[in-house]
A protein has these predicted regions:
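Charged helix-capping and loop-helix junction motifs
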Residues: 91-99, 133-139
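Substrate-gating cap/lid alpha-helix
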Residues: 120-160
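Active-site segments of SGNH/GDSL-like serine hydrolases
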Residues: 83-84, 102-136, 164
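Extracytoplasmic/secreted cell-surface and envelope-processing proteins
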Residues: 28-29, 86-93, 119-126, 165-170
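Hydrophobic/aromatic residues located in beta-strands of well-ordered beta-sheets
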Residues: 18, 77, 110-112, 157
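N-terminal low-complexity, Pro/Thr/Ser-rich intrinsically disordered segments
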Residues: 1-17
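Sec-exported extracytoplasmic/periplasmic mature domains
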Residues: 34, 71, 82, 97, ...
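Conserved SGNH/GDSL esterase-like catalytic core that processes O-acyl groups on lipids
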Residues: 12-95
Length: 170
């Protein structure tokens, strides 16, 4: 069955450096990879956070790390934020456009990873922070429309949400 970790973790080769920026989903991806995380992948993430954290801390860390690498290096930045502040999509679009413009000067290709599906019934049953399927869909749509579509798009969209909904988890 497919409910096992892959036999090998592949090191990204299209880019010299990959930055994974996000919340708990990114933190626990790093934890799951442990020592097998590729050496050219850097994680900048904090559990339970969103745009405020990124503006006050996460972006500074990302920018410093990107800026100290040679400009000739090809870099990928994957943003995986939003699940903790789903009602803030307009602010994300506005701020992330500036982030993309700044980082593209350092040879960064920008990616936005969709917020993955939630199970609102399960969240409610464990008294978790209320999030609904409709909120996730609205956030993802706003990010896609505002950042990832059209001629002047700032990001390439990675639609894991629909992929998981269509194909399942495991």
């Amino acid at each position: 069955s497919m409910d096992r970790a892959p036999a090998a973790i592949t090191t990204p080769t299209e880019f010299d450096r990959v930055y994974c920026v996000g919340d708990s989903r990114t933190v626990y991806t790093q934890v799951a990879l442990g020592a097998s995380a590729p050496s050219n992948v850097e994680f900048i993430a904090k559990v339970g956070e969103g745009l405020d954290w990124f503006k006050s801390s996460g972006y500074k860390t990302l920018y410093r790390s990107v800026a100290k690498r040679p400009r000739i290096e090809k870099k990928a930045v994957i943003i995986n934020l939003g699940v903790n502040d789903l009602k803030n999509s307009a602010s994300y679009v506005k701020y992330m456009k500036k982030v993309a413009a700044n980082l593209k000067k350092y040879n960064c290709k920008m990616y936005y990873l969709s917020v993955n599906p939630v199970n609102s019934a399960m969240i409610k049953s464990v008294n978790g922070k209320a999030r609904t399927e409709a909120q996730v869909a609205a956030f993802n749509k706003a990010i896609y429309r505002g950042l990832c579509s059209g001629r002047k798009r700032s990001f390439t969209y990675i639609n894991t949400c629909t992929n998981l909904q269509m194909k399942g988890w495991i």
